[in-house]
């Protein structure tokens, strides 16, 4: 016995495809909530940046205004008219105006020729990139000091040499004068000895300072040999070079000796003491 077969109804494909192909749309609440989040984040970032800028500007203006003090206690007296910044020293203000407002860069690196507005920036550049090379930084002031020191040392050495030369010349002059006085004294002693040995009165001395000059005139010798001494006047002029500051001056000494006419006696010249007395008298008279 067979069971009755019911007819199979065909499957509606259109409905299934339609259900599967329809996209799922997100709820309207989610769409509406996504936009305010992004806008709020961007607004927060903008406000934070603006607040930071305002804080830094206010802090810089408050810390560098006219009349404020540094941490060390120095007052900022010099005020910039362009940006209202104040400085403790005038050179700091001029450096600020030249580098910041005038855009001047007078300091250049000696190796890479990069210009800088301040010397400390050039020093930092040379230290970081060129291992602190002296070629990168100009040393004009230091070399000028060294040149000044060298010139001072040269001038000092020259003055010392001049002083030593002057002292040496003075010592030489003194030595020459001492030698001259010694030679004069020795020659005077020799003349006295010769006169005492000869037994004549042909010795005529002229005193000029510390030196003595002997005048042995032939007329006196002739008169003494004849036996009578007439009254005569003899004048002798001698020039003595005296060195005073390397200048020579001729000194003329005139001496007159009056010899009275008397008979020549041998008894008057026996003792050397009488001769010395007569010599001293003649020197005093002259």
From Swiss-Prot:
Keyword Transcription listed? The answer is yes
* InterPro entries listed in its UniProt record: VerF-like, Znf_C2H2_sf, Znf_C2H2_type
List the biased-composition ranges (Low complexity): 1-29, 37-65, 156-165, 228-244
Give compartment(s): Nucleus
Q: Where are the zinc fingers (C2H2-type)?
A: 78-101, 107-130
Compositionally biased region (Polar residues): 245-260
The job of this chain, per UniProt, is described as:
Transcription factor required for yeast cell adherence to silicone substrate.
Q: What is the protein's given name?
A: Transcriptional regulator of yeast form adherence 4
The gene it comes from is TRY4
């Amino acid at each position: 016995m067979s069971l009755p077969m019911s007819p199979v109804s065909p499957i509606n494909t259109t409905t299934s495809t339609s259900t599967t192909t329809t996209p799922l749309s997100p709820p309207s609440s989610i769409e509406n909530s996504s936009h305010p989040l992004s806008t709020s984040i961007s607004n927060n970032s903008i406000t934070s940046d603006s607040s930071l800028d305002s804080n830094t500007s206010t802090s810089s203006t408050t810390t560098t205004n006219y009349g404020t003090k540094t941490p060390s206690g120095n007052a900022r007296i010099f005020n910039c008219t362009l940006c209202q910044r104040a400085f403790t020293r005038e050179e700091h203000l001029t450096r600020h105006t030249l580098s910041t407002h005038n855009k001047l860069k007078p300091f250049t690196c000696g190796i890479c020729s990069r210009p800088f507005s301040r010397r400390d920036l050039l020093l930092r550049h040379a230290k970081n990139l060129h291992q602190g090379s002296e070629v990168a930084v100009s040393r004009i002031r230091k070399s000028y000091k060294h040149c000044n020191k060298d010139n001072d040392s040269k001038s000092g050495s020259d003055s010392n040499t001049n002083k030593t030369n002057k002292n040496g010349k003075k010592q030489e002059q003194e030595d020459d004068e001492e030698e001259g006085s010694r030679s004069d004294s020795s020659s005077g002693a020799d003349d006295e000895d010769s006169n005492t040995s000869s037994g004549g009165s042909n010795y005529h001395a002229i005193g000029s300072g510390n030196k003595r000059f002997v005048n042995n005139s032939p007329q006196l010798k002739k008169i003494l040999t004849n036996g009578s001494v007439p009254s005569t006047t003899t004048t002798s002029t001698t020039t003595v070079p005296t060195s005073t500051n390397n200048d020579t001056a001729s000194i003329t000494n005139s001496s007159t000796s009056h010899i009275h006419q008397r008979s020549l006696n041998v008894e008057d010249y026996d003792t050397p003491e009488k001769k010395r007395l007569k010599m001293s008298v003649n020197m005093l008279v002259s």
